[in-house]
Amino acid sequence: MGDPKRQRKKYETPSHPWIKERLDRERVLKRNYALKNKKELWRHETQLKEFRRRARRLLAARGKQAEIERQQLLQRLYRLGLLPADAVLDDVLSLTVEDVLERRLQTIVYRKGLARTMKQARQLIVHGHIEVNGQVIRSPGYLVLREEEDTITYAKGSPFAKEGHPERMVIEQAKQGGEA
């Protein structure tokens, strides 16, 4: 069978543990996006660092292969919904961690009005009440692709799929109260 690949961390911890400005910023992001722990935030920060690192390397690179990789990076970020279709490589450098956090399934479920709060959105996802493109996704940190965004609904077998579910009625009332 061969040797399995070694599992590696998907995040980098901060270089210094007690920088007050960073701690304050992380606390606000953790609260606003209802993250379970800072590891979730660090994972998305590391993803963003990697995108930016690739963009800086490709800005300096010349040649046919560099142009192919530029297009692939821009296409990937477009599919993730992080950049518009007409973006250039410099736009990658202006991305923030908030842009990445806005593409999480948990955030999109809340923004679409399928949940009253971010924490409820997380719970609905973990409990299997939300499906994306007909597939139940149980990971709140799943980055939703641009074409999948319109397919986010309550799961077919979920009690929330019924129109008369009491919690759905509360969510609808909260949505209408917010619009008025």
UniProtKB/Swiss-Prot annotation:
GO biological process per UniProt: ribosomal small subunit biogenesis; translation
Swiss-Prot/TrEMBL keywords: Ribonucleoprotein, Ribosomal protein, RNA-binding, rRNA-binding
CDD domains membership: S4
Record SUPFAM superfamilies: Alpha-L RNA-binding motif
Entry's Gene Ontology cellular component terms: small ribosomal subunit
Domain S4 RNA-binding: 103-165
PROSITE patterns per the UniProt record, alphabetical: RIBOSOMAL_S4, S4
GO molecular function: rRNA binding; structural constituent of ribosome
Alphabetical list of InterPro entries matching this protein: Ribosomal_uS4, Ribosomal_uS4_arc, Ribosomal_uS4_CS, Ribosomal_uS4_euk/arc, Ribosomal_uS4_N, S4_RNA-bd, S4_RNA-bd_sf
Superkingdom of origin: Archaea
Protein family according to the UniProt entry: Belongs to the universal ribosomal protein uS4 family.
Quaternary data: Part of the 30S ribosomal subunit. Contacts protein S5. The interaction surface between S4 and S5 is involved in control of translational fidelity.
Main function: One of the primary rRNA binding proteins, it binds directly to 16S rRNA where it nucleates assembly of the body of the 30S subunit.
Protein name as annotated: Small ribosomal subunit protein uS4
Organism: Thermococcus kodakarensis (strain ATCC BAA-918 / JCM 12380 / KOD1) (Pyrococcus kodakaraensis (strain KOD1))
